[in-house]
């Protein structure tokens, strides 16, 4: 950082910890690559399309990130985040002791006024730093300008913007029909309100959020805008902008390659929303395949998990393939991390969080589940894993996705709690899992029905069960915030991870073979230490790899934990290619991959722990008989002697003389090698053992010798200390003590793990057999009366009585009319609603 930047940093308010930085990133939905460089207080104003300055202004903080400028108002609903590359011009309008006013113009024609609430000197320094950032991003400005032109908001506000080249720029729904009937949902009225909003407060990359933005999202997004607003509210729009060529690149680079994930994807393609027309032909199936395949290569640690196909298939109805790909990444990384990992640890953590919330908020219902042995997680897990797309009719599930991307994962918990709350009386009658499933299935299929059939008040009588669900979720359970969910996730994290790891441990230990005389306790201790060594780069519960292996340096660390002779190694000892540990590692590596699996390690230790002197002598001999010809040459004998000295360096000086005697006897009894490398004659052991003094045969210093296994065995057995070492001392030096115990696991999780985590067939049946609660209506199909998701209590106006195919394809929607505004009357967040 330059000296100027350092000076400014001392004067401006910056995040003082990584925790605060992560909160800022989440607030603006930015990637981990973004760092908050500077911030300062300011006041934000707007200059509208008619060049009139908006009388309203918003106080807050202005942030400079690595690639973005952002604003967060004192009122949480007021904010913006836009890339530097969308900014065409920044100029100082006026400057005095009270304010330093900047004018910011974007490449798509919007202008904003920012009043810096700092001294003139600080403002000047800030402007210089902003200028440096803009200059450094200048090369990408044209790309951002072209990027913004693809959005429907551009065409809605600027009729001269040409149609996008991609035929599915607004998802499959534009051609195959959207699940939401545009006439019933008053599509054109909503488009008019969004058009007015875009003209006032900017669009796509340059959009400013005010309180009206969230309200427009909550009353249901128009079909053609849904994908764009999902991208904006989730932050995947920024991710796609920064990696605009990645999706096509992945499909091209990995074309023709195979993996286990691809095999699983193929199994599920035909089971992904099969009732939707686009997935009844190859076009839709190919698009879904492309998204899932690209995602599996992009996130190879995750690959593919069942239920991802349901989510991706639903997103494609409103989004392009590329949009869906980046939305999936954002969902998996930021919104519900760990849901689609190999162990589904994120789902299991959230199930614990959900059950704890139920216990606190609805104790009677929780007690009923416990008394009747009803496993709530068996019912709720598919809700969370499929984002309710697997259980609700699509029009309602899409409404929940609108809230989900806007508000974050807390929406899943709020809706989950509201479902139980609104059905508590019926649920209390359930005595087993199947009854609960039946009750909720009937509920989901009737979400379009009136909630208060006997009400005399017209407005109350018009409220549907789905509207009531939203009111319950966002009012009754408004205390469920993003911070609360994050804190609860942290609270349950270790317990869930330990449970998963304990389950995985039991499963893997049962599959081990060739463990000789090792006990179950020994295997357990080896497993624990093995994964303890690997914990710095991998944790079993995260499921990031199915084949974790020890490299050589990690193997040395492992042995240091179970033997005295492997402790205190320096870099030279570890890097010595001729060391005993290197020979031992190569011996353990049966598959010759350069790393050790748990099975390799167990089999190797079982050999070392076998208390048989003849077998142990053969083991050491084979370590140094590299070519497997049954003989050791002179350098090999010296290496064995060095290994014995190294192994016994903590056992006493008497081994020095024993090793010296070992060398002498090996040389004494060895045969000189013939030209073909084999000894000429066998040694007559009885004659040599009786020879003394000058009768002993000496091998020349430069002679090639060969020591056979029988000779090696005879020499070792003739030296008492070495016989003791090989008969039991080596085995006893390996102490398989337990690793320090982890904290106890969460009580009710083991049953869930037993039935769900490993039992993939059961999960597969849940999603592969997916049928919606009721078939969704499409723009070119028949509407189902139970899938109506209107949220207005007024009747459809004459302006909306146009054919569905016309109302949904005509982009010239006109200006907002008075009747449009009654859409805003019902808002589940308002305090005075029923």
Curated annotation (Swiss-Prot):
Binding positions (Ca(2+) 2): 625, 627, 629, 636
> Which keywords has UniProt assigned to this entry?
Calcium, Cytoplasm, GTPase activation, Metal-binding, Repeat
Q: Which GO terms describe its biological process?
A: vesicle-mediated transport
Recorded GO molecular functions are:
calcium ion binding; GTPase activator activity
SUPFAM superfamilies in UniProt: EF-hand (SSF47473), Ypt/Rab-GAP domain of gyp1p (SSF47923)
Q: Where is the composition biased (Acidic residues)?
A: 808-817
Q: Cite the residue spans of the region called Disordered.
A: 766-834
**Entry GO CC:** cell division site; cytosol
InterPro entries in the record, alphabetically? EF-hand-dom_pair, EF_Hand_1_Ca_BS, EF_hand_dom, Rab-GAP-TBC_dom, Rab-GAP_TBC_sf, Rab_GAP_TBC_domain
Q: Where is the Rab-GAP TBC domain?
A: 220-408
Q: Where is the protein found, in the record's own terms?
A: Cytoplasm
Q: What is its main location?
A: cytoplasm
The EF-hand domain is annotated at 576-611, 612-647
Coiled-coil features, chain-numbered ranges:
none
Its annotated function is as follows: May act as a GTPase-activating protein for Rab family protein(s).
Protein name according to UniProt? TBC domain-containing protein C215.01
Record the organism: Schizosaccharomyces pombe (strain 972 / ATCC 24843)
